[in-house]
Amino acid sequence: MDITRLTIKEARKLLDNREISALELTRTYLDRINTLDGKVESYLSVTEDMALKQAEQAQNLIDYGKASLLTGIPLSIKDNICIEGTKTTCASKMLEDFVSPYTATAVDKLFADNAVILGKTNLDEFAMGGSTENSAFKITKNPFDLTRVPGGSSGGSAACVSASLALGSLGSDTGGSVRQPASFCGVVGMKPTYGLVSRYGLVAFASSFDQIGPIAKTVEDCAIILDSICGNDPKDATSLKYENDSSYSSSVSGDIKGFKFGLPKEYLTEGLNAEVKESLYKSIDKLESMGAKIEEFSMPVLKHAVPAYYLMSSAEASSNLSRYDGVKYGYRADNCKSFNELIGKSRAEGFGKEVKRRILLGTYSLASGYYDAYYKKALKLRTLISNGFNEAFTKYDVVLHPTTPETAFKIGQNSNSPLAMYLADIYTVAVNIAGLPSISLPCGYDSNGLPIGLSFTGKPLGEKDIFRAAASFEAEFSDKFRVPAI
């Protein structure tokens, strides 16, 4: 069994045909984590005892013919998603010793399908960043080049799937945090429509943007995970009441003949790497040869997406993170002589540089005298961006675009340049602003052998359209999934 090319669908066949047991499969992944994760550093914690127990329970169900598609499948969870009785650190000193008293709804749904959870993966602190360098505990490396970043903030999840240290993973996407690392690590990452997956148990960064999404090796594997975790949840007020008439995994079949794709001209301007652009146009040629129609269109408001996103998300973060004060829970500073000193010192020592930067930006934009000048304008831009996409979807089935303007950069390259780091999300943040579904999958490799990602974005609740488009392209893409040489 070549674990480096194994997919969820293939593992399901092996398990159901009794060619391997759930316990053997789980131990294979745990052994690989023990051997290789010292190089990649994708995991913050490995839940070995829990995984082995879950594998035993899964095998019992398989033996009785009661397995779901995810029964016995080893997965990982980003460490800002809660699992009862395990640490949820958000890669922050502030929550270094926090043990979650409850389990996120999305994880509960995986438990209900008897998936096996191998551990919690690394991220940028509180999911704020695009390189996973902002973690308080370790820097995750890109499996394709250990001197480069895996992307972020779900860099640990993308790297562990790319390195075959799990068959799939749950990440969170606030401004591209599932899709951008998936692009950098050569795997598939999917952000669902806002509200399709419950946010209950996801530690909040920016509540009107945050969304849990799957990362896996194939489009179909992502669809299988989404089938498990989606659905209405009364514990989340923003959860959609949406009745799905068929599974997402069933939508990966069928061709795209006659599909109309729109390509925003604003994503083809200065700043787009030449090799990424070349790969994009080769992908367009491939889609056209499959019977699809591709047309460039203009959406001028997209040039304002990055500043609007960082203003709004930072404002929400400054509110959400105000709860961490060293009193009820979280890091508490020593030798404080007053209550005010306790709060100030605890937050100063508990939060990292990037988190502090965004709290300051958010607090500033919400302050009296600046609210109208900055935050209110950003809200207006949100409406304009949503309207722009709505208009585009009257003409096109799917919007097509690069996932990132460049391939994975060197560790430390952008550490002292917040603007350069923010611009890595230039093609992804508008999707979160509008609450749309989007999927990134590999479409090529640059001259250094680094993966390039292509994104398909759909209308609200248009997951089936983007799964169909992505799966059709994936089936024709000659290179498909490359195995990183680690």
UniProtKB/Swiss-Prot annotation:
Heterotrimer of A, B and C subunits. Gene3D superfamilies: Amidase signature (AS) domain. It catalyses: L-glutamyl-tRNA(Gln) + L-glutamine + ATP + H2O = L-glutaminyl-tRNA(Gln) + L-glutamate + ADP + phosphate + H(+). Pfam families: Amidase (PF01425). Belongs to the amidase family. GatA subfamily. Keywords: ATP-binding, Ligase, Nucleotide-binding, Protein biosynthesis. GO terms for cellular component: glutamyl-tRNA(Gln) amidotransferase complex. The active site is at residues 78, 153, 177. GO terms for molecular function: ATP binding; glutaminyl-tRNA synthase (glutamine-hydrolyzing) activity. One of its GO terms (biological process) is translation. Its EC number is 6.3.5.7. Allows the formation of correctly charged Gln-tRNA(Gln) through the transamidation of misacylated Glu-tRNA(Gln) in organisms which lack glutaminyl-tRNA synthetase. The reaction takes place in the presence of glutamine and ATP through an activated gamma-phospho-Glu-tRNA(Gln). InterPro entries: Amidase, Amidase_CS, Amidase_dom, AS_sf, GatA. The gene is gatA. This is Glutamyl-tRNA(Gln) amidotransferase subunit A. It comes from Ruminiclostridium cellulolyticum (strain ATCC 35319 / DSM 5812 / JCM 6584 / H10) (Clostridium cellulolyticum).
